[in-house]
């Protein structure tokens, strides 16, 4: 079976990540008026990082060693994304009595706390992350984002293993 070129696959992944961010901001934030929680913001940052890695890989279009480096970076980001999606799904599965308290808006976090304290708070999530505000076919938003990360991961592994 002939696979599309390395460059085309990376461009498609970069476009896919751009599409995901556009849907998140355009539809969920602007149309449905859903404010992203801390873990949602981290997942968006990971999607943007994957898109940037894939775009750089497409522009650079390296030989085999470079392809493996870019694919490895992409796979590492996928693992990070799956971790944070899983963490949010775990928070959503907690009984109400175990859900952490809600935190303050991100804008205020960086005003009040040091950068390291604010980032630590972002990475832990809060009660807002446990709230299920949207579902499709029984799967909440972090579940669908995890599906996207798994898709990016499969493509990253194929890109890593393919011959130059």
Where are these predicted regions, by residue range?
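Iron-sulfur (Fe-S) cluster-binding segments and ferredoxin-like electron-carrier domains
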Residues: 41-57, 107-111
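Immediate flanking context of iron-sulfur cluster ligation sites
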Residues: 16-17, 21-35, 54-57, 120-121
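Non-cytosolic membrane-interface motifs at loop->transmembrane helix junctions
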Residues: 34-44, 70, 100-103
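A hydrophobic membrane-anchoring alpha-helix module
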Residues: 121-164
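Interfacial segments of alpha-helical transmembrane regions
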Residues: 4-15, 62-84, 154, 158
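Membrane-interface helix caps and helix-loop-helix hairpins in membrane proteins
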Residues: 31-38, 90, 135
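Extracytosolic (periplasmic/ER-lumenal) interhelical loops and adjacent juxtamembrane/interface segments
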Residues: 93-137
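C-terminal TM-helix exit segments that contain a strictly Trp-centered aromatic cap at the helix terminus
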Residues: 23-28, 80-95
